[in-house]
Amino acid sequence: MYIPSPIVYFFGKGYIAGQTLYDAVRVTRELNKKNIMATIDILGEAVTKKEEAIFFKNECIKVLSTIDKEGLNANLSLKPTQMGLEIDRDFALNNINEIVSFAKDINNFVRIDMEDSKWTDNTLLFYKELREEFPGNVGTVLQSYLRRTPKDIDSLSDGLLNFRLCKGIYNEPRKIAYKDPYIINQNFIYSLDKMFQKRAYVGIATHDEKLIFESLRLIEKYGLKKEDYEFQMLLGVDEELRDIIVSAGHRLRVYVPFGQKWLAYSRRRLKENPNIAKHALRQFLHLQRHT
């Protein structure tokens, strides 16, 4: 379903902090006051020019520096293609290495996001290489809709591991990704169990209360302490459930994206939530009729 840009913007305002780092700081500070952590992300991906990748690298370092100076409870998320992976693998790895090295200097953390499946191998290789030098300052993301995910967990050596586990949002062929929501959910819990077996720290990224319930059963099964895991949610999604999780004493982190390149991100959120897209369209048309 094609969604016109004005409607995407109308809907997407609730999912992004704004267009500037100042906006991300403001939103993060508000979350911190509610005992909620944040991970800040500069929107943008699929960079094809080295100067643009270097710009994003410097902006990521600026985000980390600002987090440190402002005393925020937040870390950084970034995408490998934003760092130049489409241009050159080693160039992108060097950019990420520089960011993670800076994060180590200020005792912070960088999450290497997972993009569509053609980048999965390189993303995991980046994580494996960076983990050797910065074991406590870098993590990556695994997606339960990918058939390969349990084997990817097995491929990582024991030791300090840090994952975000989510369902996945990119449109992938059936031979690569499960299409049945039930199987995706089952693979989510199966993968989470494997991660806990390896004593990994996991950001359990879901708004599905059934998955949260099953995750809590695994947390109890393994006798995990509150500092051994966290839940993660998107900005602007099911704040009632978010507050329930926090009030129960669990750590929770909200994804706080900002930047000029909000369109692609907002479109993905709409495609992931077609019912919300229809609701946003109705609201938009209602406002148009009454203005």
Predicted segments with their positions:
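Positively charged, amphipathic and often flexible ligand-engagement surfaces
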Residues: 1-291
